[in-house]
Amino acid sequence: MILTALSSAIALLVPIIILGAAWVLASRSTEDREKSSPFECGFDPKSTARIPFSTRFFLLAIIFIVFDIEIVLLMPLPTILHTSDVFTTVTTSVLFLMILLIGLIHEWKEGSLDWSS
């Protein structure tokens, strides 16, 4: 009981201390024109520092990450099948795969997976 309370207290205090230190250290830097401008050998920059980014590519990357995380969640499934109730595990897995399939069909119908347009 005491060990659990001590672990919980440490788990709460360490992030608070780190965030506090980051806040104190970050407040020391002051914003001015020279610090926020890109450095090009002392001359004024030739173009903006911002590069245009394709929102189509960004959306496709986010979809990939979401489906990749869902696949990673399916990885322990064979181990779970051997250790727990088979009916519950299969039912949960089929429900999870159906939600995945519905999401994929929605993205397909929406046109998010079409790279050419």
Swiss-Prot record:
Catalytic function, reaction form: a ubiquinone + NADH + 5 H(+)(in) = a ubiquinol + NAD(+) + 4 H(+)(out)
Predominant location: mitochondrion
Keywords: Electron transport, Membrane, Mitochondrion, NAD, Respiratory chain, Translocase, Transmembrane, Transmembrane helix, Transport, Ubiquinone
Entry similarity comment: Belongs to the complex I subunit 3 family.
Name of this chain's protein: NADH-ubiquinone oxidoreductase chain 3
Organism for this UniProt entry: Lumbricus terrestris (Common earthworm)
Keyword Electron transport carried by entry: yes
Topological category with respect to the lipid bilayer: Multi-pass membrane protein
Enzyme class: translocase
Subcellular location: Mitochondrion membrane
EC number: 7.1.1.2
Keyword S-adenosyl-L-methionine: no
